[in-house]
């Protein structure tokens, strides 16, 4: 081990996020109920025969008509797909991912040592210039891969900084348009380099929101990184208020520092009546709070309509989902970075991320494993304002088919997603995207 490597010095990617902390739509973002067939036009219908919803012992048929599941008979001439006794499960939602940064599908990238958020951000810039594949192609490649693994929607954070201009949001926007048949995407303009500490960033965030390139504007560690709590929140919430976009702020700050920032975010949300439009991601100051303090904070978050996201990084940093949900706080699960300058890990597979959530939570019981899956399927859906896909009549015909015994076993074994269905149409088969 090199004496100055992150491991030798105790500075890891996770450690940097935690240690530094110690020192805030496009039409494609919402899944509207499928419209009824226009007069004179036949309904678009598919029957998925011989499937087992949630691992039911007796196979049944799922009938999709114009994008919705129905209890009625399929119209004459409906397409038939044989499920072969596979288990049908709802597709999932990635509530926090960075597709603009990815080197997914590129030649292997050797990462350089980094010891702070600022240094990791510098590595982002180096990788951006080193990769030969255009950002929009890399983002689309990763987002398409996510579809093949059963993701139906995602909230994509794209860096906004003078080093990139708006290339990130434009590239992810291009991928969103090309994958709109298979994937809902919400885009966040993310100021990875800081809102205040990097001149020119606030103007780019304003432009991205004004032109409709983003659905949300982001922020990052207002105290620990930007060192300007009020000024950063003035900018972020001001842009959101002026342009009618949401907010999603990265908050890695811990303990009292994180709580100070979080309570300031709560106050801004209430003051501008942005309830239901604000998310705080990671929120490392919440895990480990004493029970009474956690309950009080959860009640404040719920009253302000603020949602949270976690990427299940470790047992000590994952959010206490059950306790938060009991107070009415919505919590989404996400992939975070995937094969980028920050980490060689990640795969944009939300079933795997739900598996990791169960693992860091020491899940043993079937109901605990099922709850981890529901966090990936339902938590993000509620965050993005999407209808849940519980395989019942009237729900979106969005589901995946896998071989297995039951849901808990599938979460543990992570079998191949044999078929991915979006609005009643097969969009991926055997790990590959199908035609549009």
Language-model-derived ranges and their functions:
Residues 2-77, 407:
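N-terminal metal-binding scaffold of metallo-dependent hydrolase/deaminase domains
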Residues 51, 67, 85, 96, ...:
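Divalent metal-coordination and catalytic microenvironments
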Residues 102-135, 261-279, 297-300, 347-364:
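Active-site gating loops and adjacent loop-to-helix segments of metal-dependent hydrolytic enzymes
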Residues 105-157, 163-178, 204-210:
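Alpha-helical scaffold segments that flank or form the walls of functional sites
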Residues 182, 188-199, 211-319, 330, ...:
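Active-site core of metal-dependent hydrolases
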Residues 268-278, 322-404:
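His/Asp/Glu-enriched, well-ordered alpha-helical/loop segment
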Residues 393-436:
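C-terminal cap of metal-dependent C-N hydrolases
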């Amino acid at each position: 081990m090199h004496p100055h490597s992150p491991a030798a010095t105790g500075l890891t990617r996770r450690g940097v996020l935690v240690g530094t902390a110690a020192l805030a739509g496009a039409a494609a973002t919402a899944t509207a109920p499928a419209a009824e067939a226009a007069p004179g036009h036949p309904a678009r219908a598919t029957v998925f025969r011989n499937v087992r919803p949630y691992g039911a012992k007796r196979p049944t048929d799922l009938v999709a008509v114009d994008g919705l599941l129905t209890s009625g008979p399929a119209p004459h001439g409906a397409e038939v797909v044989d499920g072969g006794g596979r288990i049908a499960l709802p597709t999932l939602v990635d509530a926090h991912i960075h597709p603009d940064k990815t080197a997914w599908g590129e030649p292997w990238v050797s990462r350089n040592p980094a010891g702070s958020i600022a240094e990791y951000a510098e590595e982002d810039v180096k990788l951006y210039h080193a990769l030969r594949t255009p950002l929009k192609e890399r983002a689309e490649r990763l987002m398409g891969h996510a579809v093949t693994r059963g993701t139906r929607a995602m909230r994509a954070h794209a860096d906004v900084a003078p080093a990139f201009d708006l290339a990130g949001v434009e590239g992810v926007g291009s991928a969103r348009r090309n994958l709109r048949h298979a994937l809902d995407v919400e885009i966040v303009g993310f100021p990875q380099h800081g809102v205040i500490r990097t001149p020119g960033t606030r103007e780019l965030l304003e432009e991205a929101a004004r032109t409709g390139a983003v659905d949300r504007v982001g922020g990052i560690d207002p105290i620990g990184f930007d060192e300007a709590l009020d000024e950063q929140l003035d900018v972020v919430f001001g842009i959101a208020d002026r342009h009618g976009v949401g907010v999603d702020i990265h908050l890695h700050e811990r303990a009292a520092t994180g709580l100070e920032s979080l309570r300031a975010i709560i106050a801004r949300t209430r003051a501008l009546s942005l309830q239901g439009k604000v998310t705080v991601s990671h929120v490392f100051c919440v895990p480990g709070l004493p029970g009474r303090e956690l309950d009080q904070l959860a009640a404040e978050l719920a009253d302000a309509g603020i949602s949270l996201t976690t990427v299940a990084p470790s047992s000590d940093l994952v959010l206490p989902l059950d306790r938060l949900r009991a107070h009415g706080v919505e919590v989404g699960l996400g992939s975070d970075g995937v094969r980028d300058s920050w980490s060689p890990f990640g795969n944009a597979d939300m079933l795997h991320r739900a598996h990791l959530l169960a693992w860091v939570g020491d899940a043993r019981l079937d109901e605990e494993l099922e709850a981890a899956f529901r966090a990936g399927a339902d938590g993000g859906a509620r965050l993005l304002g999407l209808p849940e896909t519980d395989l019942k009549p009237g729900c979106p015909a969005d589901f995946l088919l896998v071989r297995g015994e039951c849901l808990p076993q599938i979460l543990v074994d992570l079998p191949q997603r044999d078929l991915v269905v979006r609005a009643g149409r097969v969009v991926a088969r055997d790990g590959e995207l199908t035609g549009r």
